[in-house]
Amino acid sequence: MKQPLGVILAGGRSTRMGGGDKGLLDLEGRSILTHVIERLAPQVADVALNANGDPARFSETKLPVLPDSVAGHPGPLAGVLAGLDWAAEQGADTIVTAAADTPFFPCDLVPQFLLAAEGMEHPLALAASRDAESGKLWRQPTFGLWPVALRDDLRAALNDGLRKVVLWTDQHGAATAEFPVLGIDPFFNVNTPQDLDVARSIARNGQ
């Protein structure tokens, strides 16, 4: 399998942060998005950003900005589709997605995805981590390995009104790549001002 392309999902509307782009918030002198790029870029062949609105606000990243092709802010699956369409233009077979507000995700994200999806005709996998208290396994719908071969199926599902990521991935027998929780959940994301304070504390401690 060719090395996947990377797509950072930044299409959310950040309502709990008062609007704006969570990825552009400062985290120890750099934007959260910069932290995400630095973790994802070494693991993939190239990186693009899924975001809506004026792409100029991301100009410092020097990344291609891919808007949703489905109207109405339908959620992460629209960003996945935008990434798959971009990947098809690049001649790639798969993409790996990461969320723009999740700065501490695993540095072995892509290898673990490829391992989990080994042998699948259309490699498809979601990340997961286990709740430290309850032991429940939580899938992470914005962190996934997605095959270009299923992009037309995804487009049709979105046009039919499907919005929930796991409904679509379950239809196609997605694998699960489980990542350990070592001190903090690696998929901790910044949704509120309080989360940002926690993220700054984690970053200061060298996560």
Map each language-model feature to its residues.
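Nucleotide and nucleotide-moiety/phosphate-recognizing core
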Residues: 1-165, 170-186, 193-207
